[in-house]
């Protein structure tokens, strides 16, 4: 297991405790993704399921069980870089202009991978379109990844 500082462990424990609604030192398995996101990770539901598939869906887990899940998600997601996402979107940039249509990006975000709702897409794309209805996908990726 990665060596975390006392401050990091205290931060992880504090976030974990916020999801412990019974005060028994455990959280619902269904809350693991939310807890990870509260700690700055951005796992997909698929990522969370891969790390928790051996646990029962209605199970409550302790911090000691949560910590290795956090580590696995942290390690797995650290490989995703802005350049990887930009490269993926570049395939949809037919004229190599640095732009893709907002309609095409909206379609990608609502149908592929971790599907977003229309409301989530609207929030992400707010103020990103130019007058022609296109989006600079490099700016978009950097904005999304910067939080």
From Swiss-Prot:
<dbReference type="GO" id="GO:0016460">
    <property type="term" value="C:myosin II complex"/>
</dbReference>
<feature type="binding site">
    <location>
        <position position="93"/>
    </location>
    <ligand>
        <name>Ca(2+)</name>
    </ligand>
</feature>
<dbReference type="InterPro" id="IPR018247">
    <property type="entry name" value="EF_Hand_1_Ca_BS"/>
</dbReference>
<dbReference type="GO" id="GO:0005509">
    <property type="term" value="F:calcium ion binding"/>
</dbReference>
<feature type="modified residue" description="Phosphoserine">
    <location>
        <position position="30"/>
    </location>
</feature>
<feature type="domain" description="EF-hand 3">
    <location>
        <begin position="115"/>
        <end position="147"/>
    </location>
</feature>
<dbReference type="GO" id="GO:0031475">
    <property type="term" value="C:myosin V complex"/>
</dbReference>
<dbReference type="GO" id="GO:0031477">
    <property type="term" value="C:myosin VII complex"/>
</dbReference>
<feature type="binding site">
    <location>
        <position position="104"/>
    </location>
    <ligand>
        <name>Ca(2+)</name>
    </ligand>
</feature>
<dbReference type="InterPro" id="IPR011992">
    <property type="entry name" value="EF-hand-dom_pair"/>
</dbReference>
<keyword id="KW-0677">Repeat</keyword>
<keyword id="KW-0518">Myosin</keyword>
<feature type="domain" description="EF-hand 2">
    <location>
        <begin position="80"/>
        <end position="115"/>
    </location>
</feature>
<feature type="binding site">
    <location>
        <position position="95"/>
    </location>
    <ligand>
        <name>Ca(2+)</name>
    </ligand>
</feature>
<dbReference type="GO" id="GO:0032036">
    <property type="term" value="F:myosin heavy chain binding"/>
</dbReference>
<keyword id="KW-0106">Calcium</keyword>
<dbReference type="Pfam" id="PF13499">
    <property type="entry name" value="EF-hand_7"/>
</dbReference>
<dbReference type="Pfam" id="PF13405">
    <property type="entry name" value="EF-hand_6"/>
</dbReference>
<keyword id="KW-0597">Phosphoprotein</keyword>
<protein>
    <recommendedName>
        <fullName>Myosin-2 essential light chain</fullName>
    </recommendedName>
</protein>
<dbReference type="InterPro" id="IPR002048">
    <property type="entry name" value="EF_hand_dom"/>
</dbReference>
<dbReference type="GO" id="GO:0005829">
    <property type="term" value="C:cytosol"/>
</dbReference>
<dbReference type="GO" id="GO:0017022">
    <property type="term" value="F:myosin binding"/>
</dbReference>
<keyword id="KW-0505">Motor protein</keyword>
<keyword id="KW-0479">Metal-binding</keyword>
<feature type="binding site">
    <location>
        <position position="97"/>
    </location>
    <ligand>
        <name>Ca(2+)</name>
    </ligand>
</feature>
<dbReference type="GO" id="GO:0031476">
    <property type="term" value="C:myosin VI complex"/>
</dbReference>
<comment type="subunit">
    <text>Myosin is a hexamer of 2 heavy chains and 4 light chains.</text>
</comment>
<dbReference type="GO" id="GO:0030048">
    <property type="term" value="P:actin filament-based movement"/>
</dbReference>
<feature type="domain" description="EF-hand 1">
    <location>
        <begin position="7"/>
        <end position="42"/>
    </location>
</feature>
<feature type="binding site">
    <location>
        <position position="99"/>
    </location>
    <ligand>
        <name>Ca(2+)</name>
    </ligand>
</feature>
<dbReference type="InterPro" id="IPR050230">
    <property type="entry name" value="CALM/Myosin/TropC-like"/>
</dbReference>
């Amino acid at each position: 297991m990665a060596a975390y500082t006392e401050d990091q462990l205290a931060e992880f424990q504090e976030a974990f405790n916020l999801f412990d609604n019974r005060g028994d030192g455990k959280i619902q398995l269904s809350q693991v993704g939310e807890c990870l996101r509260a700690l700055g990770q951005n796992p997909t539901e698929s990522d969370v399921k891969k790390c928790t598939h051996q646990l029962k869906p209605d199970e409550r887990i302790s911090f000691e069980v949560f910590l290795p899940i956090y580590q696995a998600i942290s390690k797995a997601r650290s490989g995703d870089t802005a350049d990887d996402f930009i490269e993926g979107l570049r395939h949809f940039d037919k004229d190599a202009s640095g732009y893709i249509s907002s309609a095409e990006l909206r379609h990608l975000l609502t149908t592929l991978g971790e599907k977003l709702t229309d409301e989530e897409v609207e929030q992400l794309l707010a103020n990103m379109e130019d007058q022609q209805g296109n989006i600079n996908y490099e700016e978009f990726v950097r904005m999304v990844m910067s939080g």
